[in-house]
Amino acid sequence: YMKQILSLFITSLALCTACTSPKGSDTVQVAETTTEQTIQKASSAIHYNAFSHNDYWRERPLLDALSFRFNCVEADLWLIDGELYVSHDRPEPNPAITFENLYLKPLVARIQANGGKVYPDSDRPFYLMVDCKAQGEEMYKLLKKQMEPYKEYFCSVDNGEYKEGAVLFFLSGDRPKSSLPKEN
């Protein structure tokens, strides 16, 4: 039993490392001694503690993390000319890397396809972390506006009461520290 747990741990660690390698870096290979069955077991479990840091560096942002069944992704956002772009450094405007196109629309499509859940076999919310790179107050206003059509899919607080949704959204970085505590 302990050997099986150790094998699952090693496989999960290898998968996590492979998922967190930025584009262009060497791919981490799962050890040859790991059996196909162990890989299958590890990849079928939802990795609630796995976090796809700088997720937009993946070949398929969001989708790679979901295929490895990670339960949290991070997207760094920049506000440029009234649009939210996903990038670690300030990007050139490009519709292919907008927050809505890379994260909101694909997440909502998946939730709709899975009966209101990111993972059909889990009742726990998926975590979407947004790191505001600059202009926190202005960015937050636009984020709220962009997320409004999708609000039914997100966890929320209404009059002090928590309502669970398929996705728990949270902010880091240059977040609007003064206005957020006043939000409901």
Labelled PLM ranges:
Residues 2-5:
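Positively charged n-region of N-terminal signal peptides that target proteins for export
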Residues 7-16:
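Bacterial N-terminal signal peptides
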